C-alpha cells in the first residue's frame, strides 16, 4: 500500500520536477543525434551483476532501448497484453509512472525474435513520443500525461515480423518511417500538437532502420535507409532531395552523421555479393527437406533451419513454403547490396556514384548500427568481429574478434575514449580503446546472464543497460 501511494504521489508531481535540470540526456535511439556518443560523460568500463551496480530494476518484456531526460529513464514495454511507456527515477531506479497506449489490437509480430514494443521512444526534453506498430504515435509530458496521439492501423510488416523502427525528433518535428508491403510512407508531425506536417509515400516494402537528421548546405534533411535504396528528404517539406542505390534488402542498421559526412554499414542475408549466406534453390530444399513429397516445405520439415523465420517466408500463411514464395524471397534478397560507405552532402537526384567518398564490403553488421568515434568508423557483427575503417579514407585498420562471441542486436556506444559492445546472448559488455590501429580490450566484463537486445544509454557517470528482464544502472 505504501508503495502504491508513493507511485501515485510521484505521478501527481508536475512535469517540471522531472525535467527541470541540465543533466546530460540520451534523447532517442542511439542517443544525441543518433550518434551513439556521450561526449564529456564518464561511466565505468567495468560492470557486472555484482560490479558497479548503482541500481537494478525489474522491467516487463520489450526490445526498446532506454532514453534519458531530466530525472527519468524511459522505455516501452509489453505486459498483460498492454503496451506501456514506463518512466523510472534516474537516481533510484524506482518506477515513477507508466502509461497505457490503449491499443485496440496488437500488430502481428514474431514471437521468437520480435516484440510489440521494439521501438525506442524519443524526447526533446519536454515531451516523450512513443511509437507502437499496433496503434501509432503517442505523446506524453514528463509526468506521463497524454498530450496527443497519431492513430495508425496495426502495421502489417513483411512476413509478420513486427515493427522495429524508432521515431526521432528534429527541429520540433517528429519523424517516423513505416515501411510495409502494403503501404510504405514517412510522416512528419509537429512535436507540440501532433499535427501532421507532411507525409511521403515510399517504395520500400520493408525496413527497420531508424532515420537520421542531416544538416546540409541546402538545409536539414532526414535520411532513411530502406530496401536496396537510401533517400534524403527535406525535413521541412518532405520533398525527396536525393537517393542512391546500394543498401541491403532488409535494412536493420541506421546511418550516422559525423563531421558533416553520412556513414552507413548494413548487411542482410542473400545479397548478390553475400559470401556468408548461400541461399539454396527450391529444388535443393525439396530434395533435402520435403519428407512427404508434396512439393512444398512445411514448418516441421523446415526444422531448425527456418526456426524464427518461417512466418516471414510463408506469404499466404498456409504453413507451407512453395516455389513461388521462395522465388519472391530470393528476388527480394538479390535486390540489396551489403556494404559500408561514406557519403558527402550537397547532392540532388541520383547520387549513387557522384557523392560516394568511399565504399567497403567487409565487416558489416546485421542489426547493430556502426559508430564514428576516435577518427574511425567502427562496427561489430555477430561472432564479436570488430571492424574499424579510417573515417576519412575508408582504409581498413583492423578486423578481429575483439568482443564476446554470439549475436549482436545492441549498437555500440562510446565516450571517454572507449567503445562499448554488448552481446545479445548473455549480456557480456566488452569495452575497447578507441582510435587504435589494433583492437585493445580495456575491459571484458562478466555476463549479465540475460539476453540484451537494447542499445545502452549513457548519461553523466552512469551507463544504463536493459536486459530481457531488468534495467541496470552502472556507475563507479
Task: Give the location of each predicted region.
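Positively charged n-region of N-terminal signal peptides that target proteins for export
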Residues: 1-5, 476
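Bacterial N-terminal signal peptides
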Residues: 4-16
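Noncatalytic, solvent-exposed loop/strand surfaces
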Residues: 18-476
